Each structure stands twice: as structure tokens, then as C-alpha cells.
């Protein structure tokens, strides 16, 4: 149990050394799952220990087993194929749902957590992709509609699968289940909202499906992570403050909402005044995209901007996003270590000033 102010965490993914990237790519193509899992089991303790050495309070396994934070659903269920799709003018390889989803590897997230428990006594957080996000990225009208006629049909079928994964995480003793939904956060941008016939209905639906997953499940803290997409050194996708989505977030039956505030397009922290006080706030106060290593003092300054509107008891520190949402991300691991180490130092400075 964490009983001090300004606890620290990561968002989930940590940079992977090149040999792990190569292993993931080989496993994806050749489907040698058992060999891959046996090997990665011997490697993951390194990233667990790295977070412990930095002093992070709530740790993950770095998502080193995953090709991506979204595509992990294809590791849990059959029904997906690797396809080449045009995304924003670029041909990219995506998992696309092409047949009925059948759980083939249930409890995958809980098994990730069980490995962490073997090597650390720290609190554990595991990230899951939201059903709305999965459907946005992995349903294709031409390839998927014969089995799931609409994107919404696909989304609805994801809900019971993710609900069972959440229950298994709770039963494994995980402290926090974090649902990732950067697509929901894109609706902060008026240019993106303009592409939808009824963006308000889209936002509300993304909240509704999350609430249906977690309904009646207690014994685990629930967090929602929001960001404007993480393109690494290339930056982000959407721009704008959170105010357009705050009324919808207030309907969320979660305990914590995680916001990014390091990037210059995130708006003003005064938006927290519009957020229901029942929510704890995850404050993105460490850059995960650029080369600059935030100093502890820079991180403290960002947190103190939020403290103008939020009590210290509600704030958890974290980077804006994961350092490597996809396995191909090229952020150096030593850079990430220095950043999260400074995050911990900032937390200690803040506690010395605000802990009573």
C-alpha cells in the first residue's frame, strides 16, 4: 500500500532493446509462441528491476511481450489477420479482425502480472486497450463486415472478453488496471471532431462501453489513460485542451483519469476544476517523446501548476504516455531510465514541500 503523496508510475510500455524487437517480429511472422514466451520470461525481470531501481512506486512489465498496446488483443483471441492497410497515406501492417473472435489465450494480462509478482514487491499496474480504440484500429469495412457488419458490432463483442480479462487481473491482485484510449482523447481537437457526423455520440459511446466492462467489479483501482497519440520523436496527432471531453469523462465509473500535460498543446490545468472531485488525477509531467531529459525541477514546476487547482492527495506522477506503445519505437532505454529516475526525484521534492 502506498501511503505517501505524489506516487509515481509509468504509463506502461518501456523501450525494448533491438534483440527483443527482433524476437517479437520473428514470433509474429512464425507464430512460435512457446519458444518466445520461454525466452521473454528470462528477459522481463530486467525491465521490472529497472523501474524498481529508479524508485517507481507502481510498475509494469514494460509491455515487452507485446507487439503493440492495441494488437495484444490478437494474442488473446483468434479471428485476426495481419493485413496491409493505408493509414493517413502510408501502408502499414495491422491486425484486422476477419473472422469470429474466440478467446485462445484468456488471462494473458494476469499472467503478465504474475511474472512481475515473482520479481518485485512493488504495486502492479497492467494496461488494457479500450474496446472503442480496438474497434477504431482493427475493424475494416472491406475485411471485417462479413463477420461484424459494423464497427459497433465488433466493439460490443469485445466487451465480455475484456471484462473477463479485468476480473482475472483483479483476482491476481493487481493494484491498477489502466485502460488506454488515445482515440477518445483525439476528440479534443476540433479538426478531428469535424470528421464525425455526431462526435458527442462517439465520445459518449466510448465512455459507455468502458462502464459496461467494469460494472460490478471491485477490488481493483480503475484508470483511464488519455493522450494525443504518441509518435515518438515525430510528436503527436491532435491538439487542444481537454474541456470538450470533460463532461463525458465525468460519467466514467473509474477511479483515476490520466492526462498528459508535458506537451505544449494540452491546454491549461485549470480544466481540472471541471472534473468531478471523486477522480484521482494521473498527471503527465515527464516528456516521453523528445530527447530532452526533464530535470526534477522542471517536473516539479509542472506538478505545481496543477496544484493550483487540485489537492496533492489526488495526484499521481507519470510520463505523458508509454515510451514504446509499439515494439518498433526507437526511444533509447537509458533515456527512459533517466527520465523516470528524475520523476521519482521530483516526487521526493514535492513530498518534502507538501507532505504534512
Name each model-derived stretch.
Residues 1-356:
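Domain-level signal for soluble alpha/beta catalytic cores
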Amino acid at each position: 500500500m502506498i501511503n505517501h503523496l505524489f506516487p509515481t508510475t509509468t504509463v506502461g510500455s518501456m523501450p525494448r532493446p533491438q534483440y527483443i524487437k527482433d524476437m517479437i517480429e520473428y514470433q509474429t511472422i512464425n507464430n512460435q509462441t512457446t519458444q518466445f514466451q520461454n525466452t521473454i520470461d528470462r528477459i522481463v525481470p530486467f525491465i521490472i528491476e529497472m523501474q524498481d531501481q529508479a524508485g517507481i512506486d507502481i510498475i509494469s512489465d514494460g509491455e515487452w511481450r507485446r507487439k503493440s498496446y492495441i494488437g495484444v488483443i490478437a494474442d488473446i483471441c483468434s479471428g485476426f489477420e495481419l493485413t496491409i492497410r493505408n493509414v493517413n497515406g502510408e501502408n502499414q501492417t495491422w491486425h484486422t479482425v476477419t473472422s469470429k473472435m474466440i478467446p485462445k489465450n484468456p488471462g494473458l494480462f494476469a499472467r503478465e502480472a504474475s511474472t512481475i509478482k515473482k520479481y518485485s514487491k512493488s504495486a502492479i499496474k497492467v494496461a488494457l486497450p479500450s474496446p472503442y480504440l480496438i474497434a477504431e484500429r482493427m475493424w475494416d469495412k472491406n475485411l471485417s463486415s462479413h463477420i461484424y457488419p459494423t464497427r459497433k458490432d465488433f466493439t460490443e463483442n469485445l466487451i465480455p472478453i475484456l471484462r473477463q480479462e479485468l476480473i482475472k487481473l483483479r483476482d491476481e491482485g493487481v493494484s491498477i488496471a489502466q485502460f488506454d484510449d488515445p482515440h477518445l482523447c483525439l476528440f479534443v481537437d476540433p479538426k478531428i471532431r469535424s470528421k464525425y457526423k455526431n462526435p458527442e455520440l462517439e465520445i459518449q459511446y466510448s465512455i459507455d462501453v468502458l462502464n459496461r466492462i467494469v460494472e460490478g467489479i471491485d477490488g481493483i483501482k480503475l484508470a483511464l489513460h488519455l493522450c494525443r497519440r504518441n509518435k515518438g520523436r515525430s510528436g503527436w496527432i491532435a491538439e487542444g485542451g481537454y474541456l470538450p471531453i470533460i463532461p463525458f469523462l465525468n460519467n466514467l465509473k473509474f477511479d483515476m483519469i490520466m492526462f498528459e500535460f508535458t506537451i505544449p498543446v494540452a491546454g491549461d490545468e485549470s480544466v481540472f476544476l471541471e472534473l468531478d472531485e471523486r477522480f484521482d488525477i494521473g498527471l503527465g509531467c515527464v516528456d516521453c517523446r523528445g530527447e530532452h531529459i526533464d530535470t526534477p525541477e522542471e517536473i516539479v514546476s509542472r506538478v505545481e501548476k496543477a496544484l493550483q487547482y487540485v489537492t496533492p492527495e489526488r495526484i499521481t506522477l507519470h510520463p505523458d504516455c508509454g515510451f514504446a506503445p509499439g515494439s518498433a519505437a526507437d526511444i533509447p532505454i537509458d533515456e527512459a531510465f533517466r527520465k523516470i529516475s528524475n520523476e521519482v526525484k521530483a516526487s521526493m521534492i514535492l513530498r518534502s514541500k507538501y507532505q504534512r
